């Protein structure tokens, strides 16, 4: 497999690709993934023994309840009760990590009551993607692997295996029809090869304007991608400020996501970046989102000479020197998570409270005396929640307790992972175990799904970053309930539309055979 056959963001080697399967070739369809899925930027682990237990329990419980409700297993698992069943199975295997009770799984009305509880919750997804209509790189189809191997998709086989999976129509369905997402930030990525740009800066803004005009409300916001060290890169910054007027900037300090790139750079490069910060602040576009962490297992070789640019050792000084600039660190800088075994990562944390690269990020506010550094959860929440929920709770808990609940923002990296609804449900239900709280000396629990901490993470922190008046959010949510997207969603559901549970990525090959649900 050549580099140009590889999907977006993929940094794994040819041998590592040979160890993976397409999700739509190898998976039990579950509301929540039952094994780790990668978007290609890191290596997926084989299904663990505990994940196999979870899958077995989901099947067993779902078969029983589906029969009782005169439904097929697949139909049952597409309901809210099916989602609750998956969380019950996870709690049986991992301990009580998620807030759920048996009534939700057994009683479709009880599951509906929970859904009503969260109606109108403001959820701002700080990292979403789709591709332009004329994108021709078929290698992107490798991302289809996630859903089935992760066991999440009742109907993925009904979606043609074409690039349409990643285009705008399916994006709108997955994000706004099949999840509780209120507002989405549309992102992109730079590549040394211009053919691999997913969306141009113009396309990002045009998409946002089109959707918002159709909706009659602000449902989408957009980045402009910056490319430090590219020839004449500041000319594009000037054009974006004058013509495009993005809400924030996005870039990769490693340069090209395929790496290694001749355009790798640092946030604290005074000659290169400080003139940009000055210009951005003057223009009132003072938030920059930076890909950090999330590297493949062989990052030291694959990104030789540039991998250190994916660490956070350039964040503190830049944030201190530019207090008016907001630095949103995508993937919370988590290194190639679970590069070996899940229990090794958790054992390391239990021993010394350290999570590679992410803890370095969490310590920046206190170490540098800054309050303008944020952690974003795209991809890393999804992969940790389904592989080791206890680790996930420690990971999120550390960010909340060291950085503060005002400095953690929600993101899912969808549409690569399909509908983000299961991630939303997992975050609503997740709590930090008391023994971790006590040992780490933490004071802040995650709390209720609509409590102060989770409401901040889900949307209020990003509302502040992107200049949406937080005091008007409640009123805005009511307007979202009556805009065109809300009307389309109501009609979609009334006609029997249901979440496909599709996701598009990579799973590890571990002897699985395709199962029809």
Residue spans for each PLM region:
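N-terminal secretory signal peptides
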Residues: 1-71
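N-terminal twin-arginine translocation
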Residues: 63-78, 86-111
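Mid-to-C-terminal alpha-helical segments outside catalytic/metal-binding sites
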Residues: 71-88, 111-113, 138, 152-174, ...
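Hydrophobic faces of well-ordered beta-strands that scaffold small-molecule active sites
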Residues: 124-128, 184-186, 220-224, 249-250, ...
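Active-site gating/metal-coordination segments in enzymes
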Residues: 190-310
